[in-house]
Regions:
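Amphipathic alpha-helical interaction motifs in eukaryotic regulatory proteins
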Residues: 30-34, 68, 82, 86, ...
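Beta-strand-rich binding-surface signature
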Residues: 13-16, 49-51, 59-64, 85-89, ...
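Inter-motif core of Ras-like GTPase G domains
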Residues: 74-101, 105-118, 124-128
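Eukaryotic intrinsically disordered and solvent-exposed regulatory patches
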Residues: 2-4, 36-38, 48-50, 74-78, ...
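Conserved G1/Walker A P-loop phosphate-binding module
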Residues: 1-62
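Conserved GTP-binding G-domain of TRAFAC-class P-loop NTPases and closely related GTPase folds
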Residues: 95, 109-219
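Switch II (G3) loop of P-loop NTPases
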Residues: 56-77
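Short coil/turn segments at secondary-structure boundaries
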Residues: 30-34, 45, 67, 76-80, ...
Length: 219
């Protein structure tokens, strides 16, 4: 009975949230998933949503929601949509990652210790975008660096926790007494390399096969 109740609550959540910093490529990725076509994008200041069909018979779909990445807006929009999230795609700029790693980890930390996210445990994909660029970091390196930064953040924040879990106590990231890794989280976390632009530029196809397979799986 409990399992059916949990499954029922999960099936009522149909949104896949696209999160990430500004210029990570969320909006182009959103457009590519929906139309397959390249389009010029600008920094978003509001959300965009659309139905994404997962099968040819159109019987399975989710609602893709692209949320702004600007620092002053992103938590506000996460607050608005987090309860509806069946899954989260956290988009990372693989080219700028080394420079932005602290900011990326900071935002991801805020997502991961959110009480609603911890309670609902939506599937999480870290989409390592812009892999068409030679200087892009690999998904493996990005995972290692994020785990290291999140572990550091956990230590520095533990002295003054500001986030409460569903029981009213301070939210704990990972397992106490152990270095953080993503396997310690209540949700399943996967990494994928992708390119919303594609290796052939504006005229070619995007490289989103791994992301598209993941969307089918979590739907």
């Amino acid at each position: 009975v409990i399992w059916r109740f949990v499954q029922g609550r999960r099936s009522s959540r149909k949104a896949v949230l696209l999160l990430g910093l500004c210029d990570a490529g969320k909006t182009l990725l959103f457009a590519r998933l929906l139309s397959g076509k390249y389009r010029d994008t600008q920094t978003s200041i509001t959300d965009s949503s659309a139905t994404y069909r997962l099968s040819r018979d159109k019987s399975t779909n989710v609602t893709l929601i692209d949320l702004p990445g600007h620092e002053s807006l992103r938590l506000q929009f996460l607050e608005r949509f987090k309860a509806a999230a069946r899954a989260i795609v956290f988009v990372v700029d693989s080219v700028a990652f080394q420079r932005e790693v602290k900011d990326v980890a900071e935002f991801l930390y805020q997502v991961l210790v959110d009480g609603t996210v911890l309670r609902n445990a939506p599937a999480l994909l870290i989409a390592c975008n812009k892999q068409d660029v030679t200087m892009a970091k690999s998904a493996k390196l990005i995972q290692q660096q994020l785990e290291k930064e999140l572990n550091t953040l956990r230590v520095t924040r533990s002295a003054a926790p500001t986030t409460l879990d569903s029981s009213g106590g301070p939210a704990q990231l990972g397992k106490k007494g152990k270095d953080f890794d993503f396997s310690q989280l209540p949700m399943k976390v996967e990494f994928v390399e992708c390119s919303a632009r594609g290796s052939k530029g504006e005229e070619g196809d995007a490289d989103l096969e791994g992301l598209e397979k993941w969307l089918v799986k979590v739907a």
